[in-house]
């Protein structure tokens, strides 16, 4: 199962995550988030990362042109679209994109079922809230294109492995405080998600 550590705000946290085995790092380009990072800072961090690490820019209520501009400037390899959009929105993007399904009910997780997508619990504040999607919603469905997010931590990530998710995405579950990761929690989360 692949692992994305989201809400990276500094190089130290990025390197700890990569060393521990993270497949992807998430950078939040949403100014209202406590994990917001200025594109200039993200670019500096991105340049210092080793190859073969996915760099994901998270966006809320941005136009495709602006998303492409920031992703290009910061060397992001993927744009995570963390707001409700139609399929046509993705056609306007030059950057490869991952839609986010903010699920309120079981039917919601079937949105964008023909493509890779991130499924998170619906919360008004757009992520990082630690709210969890009901796992029973994933019974008897193909989860191989789903990245699960929301309410994950080193204590519970092992529970989700049996569903066959493509990956998991964690932010608040591995923090010492908002915007700063706890290295021990990061290592423990990745160990349990990938290697146990």
Curated annotation (Swiss-Prot):
Q: Name one GO biological process term.
A: L-tryptophan biosynthetic process
The metabolic or biological pathway listed in the UniProt record of this protein is:
Amino-acid biosynthesis; L-tryptophan biosynthesis; L-tryptophan from chorismate: step 3/5
Q: Name one Pfam family in it.
A: PRAI
Q: Which GO terms describe its molecular function?
A: phosphoribosylanthranilate isomerase activity
Superkingdom of the source species: Bacteria
Q: Has the keyword Coiled coil been applied to this entry?
A: no
Which reaction is this enzyme known to catalyze?
Answer: N-(5-phospho-beta-D-ribosyl)anthranilate = 1-(2-carboxyphenylamino)-1-deoxy-D-ribulose 5-phosphate
Tell me the SUPFAM superfamilies matching this sequence.
Answer: Ribulose-phoshate binding barrel
The record's annotation in InterPro entries points to: Aldolase_TIM (IPR013785), PRAI_dom (IPR001240), RibuloseP-bd_barrel (IPR011060), TrpF_fam (IPR044643)
Q: EC number(s) per UniProt? A: 5.3.1.24
Q: Which cysteines are joined by disulfide bonds?
A: none
In its keyword annotation, does this UniProt entry include Isomerase? yes
Q: What class of enzyme is it?
A: isomerase
The alphabetical list of record keywords is: Amino-acid biosynthesis, Aromatic amino acid biosynthesis, Isomerase, Tryptophan biosynthesis
Per the similarity annotation, which family is this?
Answer: Belongs to the TrpF family.
User: What HAMAP family does the record tag this protein with?
Assistant: PRAI
Q: What is this protein called?
A: N-(5'-phosphoribosyl)anthranilate isomerase
